[in-house]
Every structure is written in structure tokens, then in C-alpha cells.
Amino acid sequence: MAEGEGYFAMSEDELACSPYIPLGGDFGGGDFGGGDFGGGDFGGGGSFGGHCLDYCESPTAHCNVLNWEQVQRLDGILSETIPIHGRGNFPTLELQPSLIVKVVRRRLAEKRIGVRDVRLNGSAASHVLHQDSGLGYKDLDLIFCADLRGEGEFQTVKDVVLDCLLDFLPEGVNKEKITPLTLKEAYVQKMVKVCNDSDRWSLISLSNNSGKNVELKFVDSLRRQFEFSVDSFQIKLDSLLLFYECSENPMTETFHPTIIGESVYGDFQEAFDHLCNKIIATRNPEEIRGGGLLKYCNLLVRGFRPASDEIKTLQRYMCSRFFIDFSDIGEQQRKLESYLQNHFVGLEDRKYEYLMTLHGVVNESTVCLMGHERRQTLNLITMLAIRVLADQNVIPNVANVTCYYQPAPYVADANFSNYYIAQVQPVFTCQQQTYSTWLPCN
């Protein structure tokens, strides 16, 4: 796994680990109350280790209990079968998120790696809380809050996840000669490992051709854990996972486990209002990594608006950090192309608007570059926008436009017949087949 590659977004605020709070009926008290899956030592000190401060026992603004409609959406996401597509001749795996969590957690326990709790993170969590946010969701981010003390634990996590994939191969597949390296090449979209003084986490992303990757994130500690308030939500899954295992009856509005949502931005209701009203807000913007600029422009394109006029300062911070993290023009191109590929699946018509929004923000708020470096990046964004237009065969806001140029006078000479027209891909289909004096420049 690449050291320090990629960025995994959650919040700098202390992550609470509230206990599982069952409803009445079969789940009241007894062996399940405050059970093995919730609670414990998790949280504190800006990392995932240490003593837990339970925000939900002494109610604070960080947590909120999901209502029945939200519980139903969460159940639908965890119960949905997601295809993990294999490269080459490898068969497609059919994964249920709740099942892969169960298998991975059990195998890690067998290897003596403790998982304090499991959470749904990112845009999927935001979708559960508010379906009409305009964000949608692609990747399914599942966080395993785990003890990763050294290199051995990181390697064990990797081996366990790859080994678990064998369980999901279709019947009849000979598993004996399939190695972990083979599984990695066949089914893993990317692997990331970060291990330094402030951050200890790893990511294994399982491939889906429609962009709906299943991302398994194993986090011991993380310095900066969110970018904006609208993506700061986490939903604690342990009570629902326990319900799946122990209840013989289906969930109903009057019989379902209590599920806790949390905003690691700080104030849950404030963050939820931002989500419902499409407002962009954050804390400590100087700590947002380089990818925050791309996320910010994505929010703008989706109709979100800044919470205050101080957004110009925020834009300058994000532009500066982007050029710190991606200083080389080649790195910038790879990052932008990757972002377009991963975040606009099925939304190709928005790519041009996104790139023009990014161009405007970079042009207006970049203060940390020499003039030629700034122009170089702006030219890169423009080039990508032109490529998008060529792929879509459209020019925005202009209908039925053809550009012409006038050839040299001797072309009109009846004896001249040696003119060569370069064969290029036109932006617009041209109906005329021959030209007497004027030639299309496309």
C-alpha cells in the first residue's frame, strides 16, 4: 500500500463512542444493553484511542437519534447487494455491506485486532439523514475503529480483507490457487496506508464499474476528520448489526434498535441545517487538505452556497493547500482526471460546469503562485474542459455554431486541385459535404 497516498476525510473533534441503546422488547437490558459492540475506550485526545467521553449519555449537540424513515434508508443501504467487478476473467462478487462488515470484524477478532465500533461515513451517511440533499452518494464508506499499533497490524488488516473476498466468490470457483496478490489485482481499486505521528489509518477500496466502490477504512487515529459540515456525519452501525444477528422479527416503526448519528463537525443540528439548506461551512479551513478545493467546487456545482462572506478567505486557504499537496502540473492533472472519473459517474453533463467553476475559483483566489505557474494550472483546467466538450460533442449555450476560415485566394483557381483537408474529430456534425470557397476549421 502506498505510504501517505490519498486523503480520507472525517472531523478533528473528538469522536464519541456512545453505548448501544436498545429499545424495549427482546433488546431491553440483559446481555445486550450497552453491549460488546458499542461503548468502551474509544475517543479522546483528537484520536481514536483513549478514554471515551460519551456525548449521548449527557446529551450534547454532537449526537442525534435516527428517526424511523432514516433507519429504513440505512437498512436499505446495508442490505443492498453491491457487485464488486473483477478485472479480466474474474467473476463478479455479490457483496452485502452488513455481511462484509460481519466477516471482516470476526476475522480481525481472531487475529487479536480489536474493532471498537463500525460507522457509516461520508455522503452515504448524509444521504441516510437527508435524502434530498443534492449530494447523492457513490462510494460506500465503512469505518472500522481499530487498534493499529504497528506495521504488523496494518499487514494483518490487508491480509484479512483479501482473505474475506474468497468467501464471496461464486460456487464452483477453485479457490486453492488464488493468492492474496491475485485478489488484490482483480478486485481492489486502490489501497492507501498512512502511518505517522498524527495519522494511523488504512483504506481498501473494492471496485465497482458504476463508481459505487465499497471502501473499508481502518482508523486508529486521524488529525483532520472532515472537510465541510455537510460531510461530517457518521452513523454508528453496531446496534443495527446486532439486531440483524439476534432478532427473529423484522424491524417496524415501533420495534427497531436505537441508532445514533453524530456530526464530528460539532453541532449536529447546525450541520443538519446546513445539509438541508445547502450551506457550505467548516471549521479551521487552514487544516483542510488539497482535495478540499475540489470538494468545495463540487458543492458549488450542486447548488450549495457559502454560509458567509468570509468564503474568500476559505477559498484562498484551499487553493494554497491544493498547490502545496499537488505542486507539479503532472500531479495536478492526475488528481483532476481521477476526481472527474470518480465523482461524476452518470453526471458527465456536469463536468464542464464543474471545471469552469474550479477555473473561476483558482483564477480569483490563488495568491501563492508565480504568474506562469498560475497560468499553467488555468490552462490545464481549460484543456480538460475542452476535452469534456469534445467527448460530449457540444458547445455550451450556443446552438448550431460552425466556425469557418477563408483559404488563400489561389484555392479559388479552377486549376488548383491539390488542397489537403486534415481529418479531425469535429465538435459539431457538419451537413455540407463540399465547399467551393469557404472551408470549415473544425
Swiss-Prot record:
Instruction: Mention one GO biological process in which this protein takes part, according to its record.
Output: positive regulation of bone mineralization
Q: What EC class does the entry list?
A: transferase
Q: Which InterPro entries match?
A: TET5
Q: Which reaction does it catalyse?
A: RNA(n) + ATP = RNA(n)-3'-adenine ribonucleotide + diphosphate
Q: Which organism is it from?
A: Homo sapiens
Write one Pfam family the protein is assigned to: NTP_transf_7
Q: Where is it expressed, tissue-wise?
A: Widely expressed, with preferential expression observed in the retina compared to other ocular tissues. Also expressed in osteoblasts.
Pathology linked to this chain's protein: Osteogenesis imperfecta 18: An autosomal recessive form of osteogenesis imperfecta, a disorder of bone formation characterized by low bone mass, bone fragility and susceptibility to fractures after minimal trauma. Disease severity ranges from very mild forms without fractures to intrauterine fractures and perinatal lethality. Extraskeletal manifestations, which affect a variable number of patients, are dentinogenesis imperfecta, hearing loss, and blue sclerae.
Q: Which family does the UniProt entry place this protein in?
A: Belongs to the TENT family.
Compartment annotation: Cytoplasm
Q: What is the lineage of its organism?
A: Eukaryota, Metazoa, Chordata, Craniata, Vertebrata
What EC designation does it have? 2.7.7.19
Protein name listed in UniProt = Terminal nucleotidyltransferase 5A
GO CC terms in record: cytoplasm
Q: Which PANTHER family match?
A: PRION-LIKE- Q/N-RICH -DOMAIN-BEARING PROTEIN PROTEIN 44 (PTHR12974), TERMINAL NUCLEOTIDYLTRANSFERASE 5A (PTHR12974:SF25)
In which ranges do the sequence repeats occur? 24-28, 29-33, 34-38, 39-43
Consequence of mutating residue 141 to N? Does not elongate poly(A) tail
What are the record keywords, sorted?
Cytoplasm, Disease variant, Nucleotidyltransferase, Osteogenesis imperfecta, Repeat, Transferase
Broad class of where this protein is predominantly found:
cytoplasm
What's this chain's function? Cytoplasmic non-canonical poly(A) RNA polymerase that catalyzes the transfer of one adenosine molecule from an ATP to an mRNA poly(A) tail bearing a 3'-OH terminal group and participates in the cytoplasmic polyadenylation. Polyadenylates mRNA encoding extracellular matrix constituents and other genes crucial for bone mineralization and during osteoblast mineralization, mainly focuses on ER-targeted mRNAs.
Q: Name one GO molecular function term.
A: RNA binding
